[in-house]
Amino acid sequence: MASSQPTSSGPILDSPPSPNPQSQLNTETSSSQHRANPSEAPAQPGPGPARPSALTKRPSHREVAAYRMSRKLQRLRADSNQPHSPTMELPDRLKDNGKEEDNEEDVLQPQGGMFMNMNQSIFGLIAAAGSTVDFHDRFEGQSSEDEDDVPNHMAMTFAGPGIKGTARNRETAGTVKSLSQTVVFNKPPASATVDAGPSNIHRRRLPGHKLLQSVPSLSRLSSSHKSKKTKQHNATAMADNKIEEEEDPDPSSPLPPLSKDETESLGLAPPIEIVRAEGNGAPLMSRMLEARAEMEARPSFDLDRLSGEHRRDDAGVTGQLAKKLKDIFEFDTAEEVIEEYPCWLLQHVLLQGYMYITANHIAFYAHLPKKAHEIAKSGYLSKSGKRNPKYNRYWFRLKGDVLSYYQDPKDHYFPAGQIDLRYGISASVNDKEKEGNYFSVSTHHRTYHFKADSARSAKEWVKSLQRVIFRSHNDGDSVKISIPIRNILDIEEAQMVEFADTCKIRVIDNDETYAIDEYFFSFFSFGKKAIQVLKVLVEDSSPEDSGANDAPKGTGGDRAIGDNLGSPRTRTFSEGVKATLSPVSPIQIASPSSRASGDYFKSSFDGTRPFSRRSFDASPGTAGYAGSPPRRLHGDGRRSFSKPRHEPHASTDSYAQSFDDPSQASLSALVASGSEDQSASQILRGSDVFHSPIFRRSASATRATTEGEGVAAPPIVRQHTAGLVRLHGPHHAATTGQIGDHMAEAEGGPSTPMLQSIAMMGNYPLQRANAFMGYLDQQSRRMSNLLATESMGYVEKVSGMWKGGKKHYDHPAGRRTEREDVEDDPEERALSEARFQAHFALPETERLQAAYFGFIVRVLPLYGKIYISNRHFCFRSLLPGTRTKLILPLKDIETVDKEKGFRFGYSGLVVVIRGHEEIFFEFAKAENRDDCAITIIQSLDAARYLAESQEVEEAQAAEAERDALNQARNEEFPDHEIELPRQASGVSDAPTILFDDPKASFLNFKPSEPMRITCLTIGSRGDVQPYIALCKRLLEEGHRPKIVTHREFKDWIESHGIEFGPVEGDPSELMRICIENGTFTYAFLREANSKFRGWLDELLTSAWEACQGSDLLIESPSAMAGIHIAEALGIPYFRAFTMPWTRTRAYPHAFIMPGQKMGGAYNYITYVMFDNVFWKATAHQVNRWRNKYLGLPNTSLEKLQPNKVPFLYNFSPSVVPPPIDYSDWIRVTGYWFLDEGGDKWQPPKELTDFIAKARADEKKLVYIGFGSIIVSDPAKMTQEIIDAVLKADVRCILSKGWSDRSATVDGVEKPKVADPSFPPEILQIQSAPHDWLFQQVDAAAHHGGSGTTGASLRAGIPTIIRPFFGDQFFFAGRVEDLGVGIYLKKWGVQSFARALWEATHSSRMQMRAEVLGGQIRAENGVDTAIQAIYRDLDYARNLITLKRQKHQSRRNSVATPTPGAKPNAPEDDQGQAAEEDDIDADDEEEESWTFVGGNEDDLTGSMSMSRSDMLSQTVADLRGVKVGKAPALGSRVLSSPPTSPGAMRGAGGVKYV
């Protein structure tokens, strides 16, 4: 014994600092709070020993803070890689000399350094202090009960379930009472835990200290507390130890109690029992020190935490599973695992997991990952208003913990309202309604009523909501429940689930509240055996408990807990129930119980999990929760305060509630009743920091006197019986400090309070009066201050709101002004942050950084307030009568652009969003606009990369914990496999939650027979290359692909073993027209009309011939012929392209790119305009070709329905995110890369030597190539490139490709100009595979074709784009918006040189390019495209089938066919069949009708018209032509041709196009 005492104090006190500095800071904070309050001196009245002034040898507070900050900065520095570079200083040679203007540098230049202190707000400090600080000690002196020890469980192992009395020998009825309470587990954010220490060491813990040992992070937090009060009562402890050494009491009899004098003087009920265990102390202590040193050397997160390699068996005999359970559930020792069973936890849901029965605990574990970013369910519902009973229809989306509803399902950033399910109580179908399609969701704030379209839909919504509520009430990514066997009252079998054995375990939560919790477990296998083992364990511990407690039996044979709670012989528990969620009965879904109501206050540690939710608070608008602080996890147990609460759902208050502490029970209601509206004070009233010191803790059993009164304060007694629980469900009123009167009546016994409560009633009037007087005094002082100052404050607030402005609450990169630093008020900042979180239903981890007043411009400018936090960009309208809200995650923002405002004198800001249209804002002052833009840009990288990495680490840690436990379990219990429930009759509406929710199975849609697949495309090399990659993969799938394109690509295609088919046309001529005239300009149309009529006819004819015999057609829509060929052949038809071609509000058409962001309406109209112009220019020839060669009638853009055709976009979703308004059959698959730089290709020695020399000279190396385009003056461009390379001081690999083709003018070739000679800094090559070459350079500059852009982005290098025509402007804009390159809008030596220098020196651009490159490399676009083809094949086939059926019905409905007409007649203008000229007017399949006035020759200039073009269409054609009426004028077939084309034109008809 003499050697054990120094061991416990010496090494522990002198141990190095914990690797988790948060725990040390919390301890220091707790100590400082004690010292800061003289009235709360730690000295206790009585002869007990005084508390030492210095309990432990710890580093100072400043050292701990410095250590923590250095560790945090080190971690962030490693993750961030300095994403925010300071504004770059250009060399003098590249500075603007006043002769050129460059517009691209405003956005593309990197901004200031990244903000590193996102979580350093007042709430972070509150969480840091609240995690371990005992807030009770602020309001009263130290209680002697806090000095108690708990018995060691090291030697308490069972040999098997059949051995009785083992645990009884290790525990005594006189064990010291500690304030053990149910603890919320925290998710393990750290990598390792510290061994609990030698079992034979006399240790002192904080009250209920083992409750902190739920996860390894808690172990580190608790390690700093283990020696806090070790030196206290050393003499007494030594004496007690001697008694225990000399005496060997009978296991069945309790130890003799201490005398009354000893009890009162020491504040201790029984003596401390020290149980010896095997092993020596020194090796264990050395292992503790080694473990701590190992933890300090590790980073903050390590997935090897559960690997077991660095751990040693504490006792040397336990198995691997026991060690894992010790790590996960933080047992003191590795307890022997008696049995393990797969089971289901029954609450609102059925949760699949495993039960582990150890010597001293029953543990339940289930992996339940958070799904904060997944949409659980979406669809239309009707919702009634708060005051209006009418049901309005909205689009609902259940994502994360929030149920949001929208007026427009495509505007998911603008919710019409939100329901925060973290405060959810339950979701249930209303049984009163016969239809069964009404359901409600209850929260602490209010009850919401919904109406679904069907009863089935309502049940599905309820089940999804129950799952989300369950997940939101669990802290972390796993459900953990640890029940000490000594706390179990009884175990009953309950028939609740058919084909399963269900047991109900009633547990005393802790020995302060004596709440009785119920846990229901169902076993679909091994059920009888499991329940028998549990009963044997409970029977082993019950004799000792009954003998020690002598508690009388209540009704129904259950114990009535608490009759003798005031006695020193009170039954106590060494620890309480530990759980990540509170127990809820499965039969109590709609029960007005505190447990059922979701009173699950969560806790987490901001120091170790800066992005997690710190606490789960009650709704700030509920009066009943005014005095309810959030439940924080620290040494005191379940809540920071154990004072009672008012439940809004319960009935009248009982004696136990009213007389527990009148100052709390009444004053909280008084404060809450002052205002019904949500305010900042109400939002923050749940936080311990904002509680008045007059709130005192209720007296406990071992406290002799209350602090302020000096009168006896016996403990509160709360009685529960099994009959009560069975009648009303497990109300668990003791856990919230109240029992309803209806509960006392249902109990069947008298509701008279105990003598202790009666004694307390005598003091109630005086205490109530004192509390009320204190409240009045406080309110009077507050009102006087309000009259003096607040009136002016409100005026200032309102005037400031309308005047506009800005304010920085947090200070990223020094954005705060000096005035803001001087006027900074932490309390005001906390209030503003809480209001912000309440406005947008955001978690408390959301840190408000800045706020601005401005206008959001949608249809009309709307005034409001802009909020920027560490994760979201939000807007809230301030005009009365408006409710516009914007909630935009920062990770969805690509960039922000500064532009002119829509109104004169206003400055505009454009927020570019992934897959969504831009959002425009206006500011009254340009400086506020600039400040807002800089703040957003500085926050983007941290929100996009750091936050995601943190979430990934947390998820990986939970998975590692699960995998380690499964591995150990499978080794010891390989035959215990879980079974799914066949039928849940007792809880038929309870949804099941599996370990990992299975995704929809990926079915194999591959056709059984190989197909002949034809790919039709025209254009440049970049248009053909993706199809080669696709066809190579189709060959591997067993199909027979064929590429139909220009003849110049024949050898290239056939070299890959792919069949080739030719089409006519010269792509270089088309490119020349586009470059010289622009894409689809008036000059382009005029020249194309005059020169490309014949080219289009040849293209259509050759394409029809080349596609014969195909089973599937995939076409680039620029080829124009494929959709008609597929219709004629009756084969499925897909489209595939390299740029957006489908109508959307997110991006403008790639051929009609504006000079600035124009918004969603403009973007959409560009597609409509292009489709109509493109069809109008080609309709005449296409319809004539359809009639002559395909045997099809005339068609129109509406009848073709191109927007319903399945589409494959072969670019990356990371580069062009799919817009939210894309249909299901439109898929962005990823790039179709053709890697040709493999082993077969060897780079020239000249190229490798040039690259090596550039690296040796430490020069930046760039690639420049404009290979697929034609330039008017190649020599001039070459000279500009040479000058820019020399000016930027880089080395260049130049590839010209097609750019040296000579253009022709009027058939005469222009004379070639000799290219200038290249300096040694430039190496010219003819060609090289991009997949090899781009990996050798630091940046790439090219024309911006889709394939080349994808190759450079995949390499992860910055990209400079100089667009020439077509989609190149679109991809240049995308590269600029993503921040991975430069859009070179102005070409010249100076501009190009500056772009080269910035691309090779901007670390921010390089980091973003590398991240994007990794995302693209992780994709497999070709495989994704093939799977999409298989999935949509039937859909495409059905579209063609419907069209052919329509053609047949048209043929049958023709009234007067033309005699002798032949569908495939070679004549152009004579003898057309009837089906070609009858446009079915009664076509219900059409999307819309388009009537174009005038004639085809208005555009083409041609004066000749075919007979098929002389049909007139009137409005009467829209009515029922097929129902027996005479054909309308426009639908009649002209049996005899008119005398002249002008005769029909003179009739003034409207021609159908």
UniProtKB/Swiss-Prot annotation:
Protein location: Cytoplasm; Preautophagosomal structure membrane
Molecular-function GO terms, alphabetical: sterol 3-beta-glucosyltransferase activity; UDP-glycosyltransferase activity
Keyword DNA-binding: no
Disordered as annotated region, ranges: 1-106, 189-270, 542-569, 611-662, 805-825, 1446-1504, 1527-1553
Entry keyword Lipid metabolism: yes
Biased composition (Basic residues): 223-232
GO biological process: autophagy; carbohydrate metabolic process; lipid glycosylation; protein transport; sterol biosynthetic process; sterol metabolic process
Biased composition (Low complexity): 211-222
UniProt keyword terms in alphabetical order: Autophagy, Cytoplasm, Glycosyltransferase, Lipid biosynthesis, Lipid metabolism, Membrane, Protein transport, Repeat, Steroid biosynthesis, Steroid metabolism, Sterol biosynthesis, Sterol metabolism, Transferase, Transport
Ranges annotated as biased composition (Polar residues): 1-10, 25-36, 651-662
Catalytic activity: a sterol + UDP-alpha-D-glucose = a sterol 3-beta-D-glucoside + UDP + H(+); ergosterol + UDP-alpha-D-glucose = ergosteryl 3-beta-D-glucoside + UDP + H(+)
PH domain mapped to chain residues: 374-470
Pfam family, one: PH
InterPro entries (UniProt xref): ATG26_PH_GRAM1, ATG26_PH_GRAM2, EryCIII-like_C, Glycosyltransferase_28, GlycoTrans_28_N, GRAM, PH-like_dom_sf, PH_domain
Membrane topology: Peripheral membrane protein
Any GO CC annotation of this UniProt entry: phagophore assembly site membrane
Compositionally biased intervals (Acidic residues): 1466-1488
Chain's role: Sterol glycosyltransferase responsible for the glycosylation of ergosterol to form ergosterol-glucoside.
Domain notes: The GRAM and PH domains are required for the localization of ATG26 to the preautophagosomal structure (PAS) and are involved in autophagy.
Similarity comment: Belongs to the glycosyltransferase 28 family.
Protein name in the entry: Sterol 3-beta-glucosyltransferase
Organism: Neurospora crassa (strain ATCC 24698 / 74-OR23-1A / CBS 708.71 / DSM 1257 / FGSC 987)
Gene: apg-12
